[in-house]
C-alpha cells in the first residue's frame, strides 16, 4: 500500500514574462537612427517629427539627434520628436 496520499494537481503555476515597456530614451538624450525611444501598448505617446511607429506601437528614431517630449492639441497628446544633431 502507498505510504502517502497522491500529490494532487493544480491549475496554477504559470506566468507571463515581463514585457520591458516604457521610455527608453529621455528628453535631451542623443540617439542614433533606429534607436527605440518608447515601447508601449497602444499610443500613450504619439510620433512627431523624425519619429517612426512599429507595428506594436514602439516609437523609434528616423534620424540621429536629440529626443524631445511635449504636448500638442486640445487633447494634450504626448508627442515625441527627434531634432537632428
Curated annotation (Swiss-Prot):
Pfam families per the record? Ribosomal_L27 (PF01016)
Molecular function via GO: structural constituent of ribosome
Q: Which domain of life is it from?
A: Bacteria
Output the InterPro entries linked to this UniProt entry.
Ribosomal_bL27 (IPR001684), Ribosomal_bL27_CS (IPR018261)
**Gene3D superfamilies linked:** 2.40.50.100
Provide the GO biological process annotations: translation
Tell me which UniProt keywords the record has, alphabetically. Answer: Ribonucleoprotein, Ribosomal protein
GO cellular component terms? cytosolic large ribosomal subunit
Family the UniProt entry places it in: Belongs to the bacterial ribosomal protein bL27 family.
**Which PANTHER family does the entry link to?**
LARGE RIBOSOMAL SUBUNIT PROTEIN BL27M, RIBOSOMAL PROTEIN L27
What HAMAP family has UniProt attached to this entry?
A: Ribosomal_bL27
Q: What's the protein here called?
A: Large ribosomal subunit protein bL27
| Originating species | Variovorax paradoxus (strain S110)
Q: Quick one: which gene encodes this? A: rpmA
Amino acid at each position: 500500500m502507498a505510504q502517502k496520499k497522491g500529490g494532487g494537481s493544480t491549475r496554477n503555476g504559470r506566468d507571463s514574462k515581463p514585457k520591458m515597456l516604457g521610455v527608453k530614451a529621455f528628453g535631451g538624450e542623443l540617439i542614433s537612427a533606429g534607436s527605440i525611444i518608447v515601447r508601449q501598448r497602444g499610443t500613450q505617446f504619439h510620433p512627431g517629427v523624425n519619429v517612426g511607429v512599429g507595428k506594436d506601437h514602439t516609437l523609434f528614431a528616423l534620424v540621429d539627434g536629440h529626443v524631445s517630449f511635449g504636448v500638442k492639441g486640445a487633447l494634450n497628446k504626448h508627442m515625441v520628436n527627434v531634432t537632428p544633431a
